[in-house]
Amino acid sequence: MEPATGILLPLLHRLPMELTDLPYSPGALQPHLSERSVALQHGQHQRGCVDQVNARIVGTEWEDAPLERIVRESQGALFEAAAQAWNLQFQWQSLRPRGGGDPVGRLADQVKRCFGDTASLRKAFNDAALGLFGAGWAWLVLHPDGSLAVVVTRNAATPLTSHSVPLLACNLWEHAYYLDYQNDRARYLEAWWKAVNWEFAAEQMPG
């Protein structure tokens, strides 16, 4: 019997966009973020966004486009799914096991110039994050003029669509912290800073 290639090949076709792996194990950010919380965000929420992107780009002009281009150039439901998928992946890189502390080198100099010190940056970041009503993201970004700033975006909006360079991302959707901290966003932010990846942030700075 000949193989039913007309049926099998479409099922084996590689989807345009795949869920990227975590840069560490789901339990590696404990005790700041639990294994269950990380696994839920990555395995369900981020996977769901990737699935939504694939459902909308197969057979279209976007099918072979990198995720960053889709985020920058698409609109509507495709943008929302693509941007949230990108934001979530950037979030995982913004965190690391045994993270926290203070930045060093050129990034530390910029923090001192723009905020005075790391403690003042944390306060500005936390104030902005706590001031957001509903879902969204808090970011540390580098503006084209070389200054650092804290930016808050609503829902899936992202600085990737602006001229600023994102350095760090903090997920302010309630599902990001409810399992560990219920509705206490302030405690979540305190834990987030203990896992922040300053090395990754510094690597995003051009030049």
PLM features: residue spans?
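Feature for soluble, non-membrane regions of globular proteins
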Residues: 11-207
